[in-house]
């Protein structure tokens, strides 16, 4: 026969949580929220989610109430261990003490260093770890003048990072939001009498762009030892290999943010 109406629902069970327990270098954002998945629908229950240190969270759930995506209302503190607890109360028992059914922890990503490392390999590794995407959709090129690092992103995810050389003080690379206007595998600069391989203009007048280390007609190429410090006349230089990689990846209209 049918079960008695008073028969209680089995307690909800957490199937999975992202970020997983004990994960480090976590960056919670709208594209990477906290996700709690239950074994079955939790419609018959009140579910409580809590972070410690305390942080107010907003959430949305799927129609079946088996998956909840949580976002803190304000960004979580950098380099901090957070505990996530999930608890429930039965319907009609809103005043009851919540029963805890899950606890896990994660560590947020540390703040970016104030001073960038002189070792360019270390600096690149730091940039890959600490550069936050400023645009969440499509392709975009991030150029950090302070670190002399270019980071390329697609749909909010890091694709690669490269050491660059931007404009000398007084001949600074302009800051702001731009887009790739035109491109050519090899461009001749009448002004400086040299070739600029893998040219990608970022300003409509074509005065500023991204290109490989320049070379003279006789074949002499600017050395890679200048990468990592601002030595150009305003353009953004990439090393051999890196320039071809960015050129092959980017499109006309790809956005560029210089900061």
Annotate the PLM regions.
Residues 1-125, 130:
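Acidic, low-complexity Ser/Thr/Gly/Pro-rich repeat segments typical of extracellular/periplasmic
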Residues 35-37, 83, 140-142, 151, ...:
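Soluble periplasmic/extracytoplasmic beta-strand elements of cell-envelope proteins
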Residues 38, 72, 108, 164-166, ...:
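Hydrophobic residues in beta-strands and at strand termini
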Residues 40-42, 72-76, 82, 86-88, ...:
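A mature extracytoplasmic/lumenal domain signature
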Residues 43-47, 148, 254:
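Short beta-strand/loop motifs in extracellular/secreted proteins, especially
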Residues 64-66, 134-136, 171-177, 184-259:
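Exported/periplasmic cell-wall-interacting domains
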Residues 126-169:
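A structural motif detector for short, solvent-exposed N-terminal "entry" segments of globular domains
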């Amino acid at each position: 026969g049918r079960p008695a109406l008073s028969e209680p629902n089995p307690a909800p069970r957490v199937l999975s949580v992202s970020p997983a327990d004990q994960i480090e270098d976590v960056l919670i954002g709208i594209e990477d929220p906290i996700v709690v998945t239950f074994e079955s629908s939790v419609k018959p229950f009140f579910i409580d989610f809590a972070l410690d240190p305390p942080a107010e969270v907003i959430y949305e759930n799927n129609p079946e109430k088996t998956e909840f995506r949580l976002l803190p209302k304000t960004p979580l503190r950098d380099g901090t261990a957070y505990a996530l607890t999930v608890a429930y109360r039965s319907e009609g028992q809103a005043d009851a003490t919540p029963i805890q059914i899950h606890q896990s922890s994660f560590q947020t990503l540390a703040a970016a260093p104030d001073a960038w490392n002189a070792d360019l390999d270390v600096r690149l590794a730091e940039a890959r770890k600490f550069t936050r995407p400023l645009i969440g959709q499509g392709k975009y090129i991030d150029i950090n003048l302070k670190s002399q690092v270019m980071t390329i992103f697609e749909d909010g995810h890091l694709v690669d990072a490269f050491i660059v050389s931007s404009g000398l003080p007084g001949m600074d690379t302009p800051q702001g939001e731009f887009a790739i206007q035109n491109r050519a595998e090899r461009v001749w600069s009448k002004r400086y009498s040299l070739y600029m391989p893998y040219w990608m203009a970022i300003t409509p007048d074509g005065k500023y762009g991204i290109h490989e280390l320049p070379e003279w007609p006789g074949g002499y190429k600017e050395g890679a030892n200048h990468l990592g410090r601002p030595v150009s006349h305003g353009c953004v230089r990439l090393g051999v290999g890196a320039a071809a990689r960015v050129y092959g990846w980017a499109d006309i209209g790809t956005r560029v943010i210089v900061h």
